[in-house]
A protein has these predicted regions:
Chain A
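Short, conserved "switch-loop" micro-motifs in signal-transduction and mechanochemical regulators
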Residues: 73, 85-86, 97
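The short loop immediately C-terminal to the conserved phospho-acceptor aspartate in CheY-like receiver
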Residues: 56-58, 78
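Short amphipathic alpha-helix used as the core "switch/output" element in two-component signaling
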Residues: 39, 61-76, 93
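Receiver (REC) domain switch/output surface
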Residues: 112-130, 137
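Acidic, metal-coordinating helix/loop segments flanking the phosphotransfer/catalytic sites
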Residues: 19, 30-50, 58
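Two-component/phosphorelay signaling modules centered on CheY-like receiver
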Residues: 11-30
Length: 149, 576
């Protein structure tokens, strides 16, 4: 089962997101700020597959901090950034830092939860394929070194 | 040199008198009384007095007396002045500006009797630097031929020294007026009170019959009457000049003062809005009120034409310089007030920007959560679940909507926080009311109140300021551990026209890194509420032209310090 960490400083937001992704069969965990998120990311075993984090919590750079912590722990952990109104520029910054994607919390007429689930599924697939690729490469490298022997 | 002046005794008298004149004693009456007594005694005279010119009535009023025979009616004697003979030696001296000495008053054509025992009399004028008579020193003796040339010369020196001191006093008065007015810079007083203050200060330093202030309207197309003492006072905000129209309009357009003793003879004169009937005007100064970028208005001072030809009442160059200086300072004050207003506007706009961004963020988050609940509700309903499964979702939706409403209501409060309806109020009463309102009755938290007596009233919106204090009391109380304390104090501010209010507690205090943020909208370390409290408190204090700071030590308690300006003094409270 894929494990997802939901980071947001609003109880109601965490509850709603968690409920929705659990419905899809994912295992969800919560953190209410960046420092709690960093602790959980560093101690999780195995690492989280996907981290869904709010962009702005204690500071404007909260989302970026969580992102850095996640990829430092496991390069293949995918991070999806949630942005409230007016933070798209920051979200784009996160994309440059290696986030999988960003989801705007408020898009009129759109069920953003369905969109989020879709993004999580895509992120999970990419993680799976990244890990698969890495394992294959690993095997090839091993076989080459065995041939050399 | 004659015998009298050359003697050591004579020099000692000069020394005594000049010491009196240069003394730091500010009470002119004390000094004049002492000089008169010394002069009388040293001249061997029996009686002496000084009469000062009353410019308005063209009379001499006995002001200082010495020697025998003075009683209540005598000391209030007013001497009509005329150049005709038989109308009094004092009046004659005032008119001619020359000394007069007689060895036998009964042979003197000017003499009129106020005391039966007078035989010799000597009177010399006290003239200002423009040669205008300000008063007359009069010395009398019951002996014939009591005074010689040397006495006359001596008395002339005394009169000149007195004139110097009178002039110095006038200058000191003007300096004091300028200094006192200078203090207004940055005080941000209400304009009406400010203009009244200018008129009062000018009237203390220059005797005049009327004074008016015209200020340009917003689009700078007309000079509108904003303040006036006399008749013209009935036409405040009605009487106006176009730029360049009349002497007043010319002054505004050219940025230069005008001083004239006969406005009607001036080709620029139009006589549109006059404080006095045109034929009664004896002197006029119109000075431009100059701001940083342009002329803001005109300060106009008028004196009534004297009915007595000998009483000069045109304004002097010094008068013009003083009025011009006052007008310039008024310009600086109006400019500075405008600047502060603009700065506050900029700050307010910045606060607004932040408020809007943060509100949008918070509303966005709530709406996102509500949409999550709706999404789940739809799912639950599609699954055909029982009502019980829906209840938590409906509750959550209700909470979400409630929080949205909370944001809206705080937002509205932020908007109205700075719309004030002010009047002078007692700060102690406000603080007491707020404490009564916000501090719970049954609690083990101790309340300490220290209210300083005799604080000046503040110009405040009582309802808003009370709310602001209540918020701080409530804030302090909420952070108190058991048996903690909340201390509320009022005291004089850092300047005489400020008051300080302090709210201290023994709670956890504010961490250094949060001190800058606590007044920002939606900043809160409390789980309940949204943190708009302190930003509204700051908004209200700012709107009162006050300041608020948190000066507590983290770990020891919070300390909120508010400094508010006292209400501008009105003319009435000045008189009181």
């Amino acid at each position: 089962m894929y494990r997802i960490l939901v980071v947001d400083d609003e109880d109601a937001v965490r509850t709603a997101v968690r409920r929705r992704i659990e419905r899809e069969g994912f295992e969800a965990d919560e953190a209410e700020n960046e420092s709690q998120a960093e602790k959980k990311i560093n101690s999780a075993e195995p690492p989280y597959d996907v981290v869904v984090t709010d962009m702005v919590m204690d500071s404007e750079a909260s989302g970026a901090t969580v992102l850095k912590a996640a990829v430092s722990r496991d390069i293949f952990t995918e991070v999806i950034v949630l942005t409230a109104y007016g933070n798209v520029a920051n979200a784009v910054e996160c994309m440059k830092l290696g986030a999988f994607d960003y989801v705007e919390k408020n898009i009129p007429g759109v069920d953003v939860y369905d969109l989020l689930v879709l993004k999580i599924e895509q992120a999970v697939q990419r993680r799976r394929s990244s890990i698969g690729t890495m394992r294959r490469a690993d095997r090839i490298l091993k076989s080459i070194s065995e041939d050399d022997d | 040199m004659t015998k009298f002046a050359c003697t050591c005794e004579g020099l000692a008298v000069f020394d005594r008198i000049s010491s009196l004149l240069i003394s730091a004693d500010r009470d002119l009456d004390n000094i004049m009384d002492a000089i008169l007594l010394t002069t009388m005694e040293s001249m061997g005279a029996g009686r002496a007095f000084i009469a000062m010119v009353d410019y308005e009535h063209g009379e001499l009023a006995v002001r200082y007396t010495s020697g025998s025979g003075w009683n209540e009616p005598n000391t209030r004697l007013r001497l009509k002045v005329s150049q005709e003979s038989g109308r009094g030696i004092t009046g004659h001296v005032a008119v001619t500006g020359k000394p007069h000495r007689t060895g036998n008053v009964h042979d003197d054509p000017y003499y009129i009797s106020h005391f039966s025992d007078v035989v010799s009399e000597i009177a010399v004028p006290i003239c200002d630097r423009h040669g205008r008579t300000q008063g007359v020193i009069n010395v009398e003796s019951s002996k014939p031929d009591a005074f010689g040339e040397e006495h006359e010369a001596f008395l002339c020196v005394i009169a000149n020294l007195t004139a110097l001191r009178l002039n110095e006093d006038l200058q000191a008065k003007r300096q004091a007026a300028l200094v006192s007015f200078g203090r207004e810079i940055g005080r941000f007083a209400r304009t009406t009170a400010l203009l009244q203050k200018v008129i009062r200060l000018v009237s203390e330093a220059i005797s005049f019959q009327d004074c008016s202030i015209f200020l340009f309207n917003k689009d700078h197309t007309a000079l509108v009457l904003e303040a006036s003492l006399g008749e013209l006072g009935k036409h405040i905000r009605e009487a106006h000049y176009a730029p360049g129209e009349g002497i007043t309009g010319w002054v505004a357009e050219q940025g230069r003062p005008v001083r004239t003793s006969d406005p009607r003879a001036d080709p620029r004169w139009r006589g549109l809005h006059e404080e006095l009937p045109p034929d009664k005007v004896g002197g006029l100064i119109a000075a431009p009120i100059v701001g940083y970028e342009r002329v803001l208005g005109v300060l106009r001072v008028l004196r009534r034409r004297s009915e007595y030809a000998w009483v000069p009442n045109n304004f002097t160059e010094e008068d013009e310089e003083f009025v011009t200086a006052m007008a310039s300072m008024l310009g600086a004050i109006i400019d500075s007030a405008e600047l502060v207003k603009r700065l506050m506007e900029v700050e307010r706009m910045a606060a607004w920007g932040e408020m809007s961004a943060r509100s949008a963020h918070m509303i966005g988050n709530r709406v996102f959560a509500i949409k999550g609940d709706l999404n789940e509700l739809r799912h639950v309903m599609a699954q055909g679940c029982a009502r019980d499964a829906m209840n938590p979702l409906i509750n959550s939706l209700e909470r979400g909507v409630f929080r949205l409403e909370e944001i809206l209501s705080e937002f509205r409060e932020f908007v109205v926080a700075t719309r004030l309806t002010t009047q002078p109020v007692s700060i102690n009463e406000l603080v007491s009311d707020a404490v009564r309102e916000a501090f719970p009755r049954n609690t083990d938290v101790r309340l300490e109140m220290e209210l300083a007596p005799d604080l000046p009233p503040v110009e405040a919106d009582a309802t808003k300021l009370r709310r602001c204090f209540s918020e701080l009391v409530e804030n302090s109380f909420n952070f108190q551990p058991n048996h903690g304390f909340v201390r509320v104090r009022t005291e004089p501010g850092p300047q005489p026209d400020r008051v300080r209010v302090l709210f201290e507690d023994h709670g956890p205090g504010i961490p250094e890194e949060n001190k800058k943020s606590i007044f920002r909208p939606f900043f809160s370390t409390r789980s309940k509420g949204m943190g708009l409290g302190l930003s509204i408190v700051k908004g209200i204090v700012d709107a009162h032209n006050g300041t608020i700071r948190e000066t507590g030590v983290h770990g020891e308690g919070a300390r909120f310090e508010i400094v508010l300006p006292a209400a501008a003094e009105t003319e009435q409270s000045q008189e009181n």
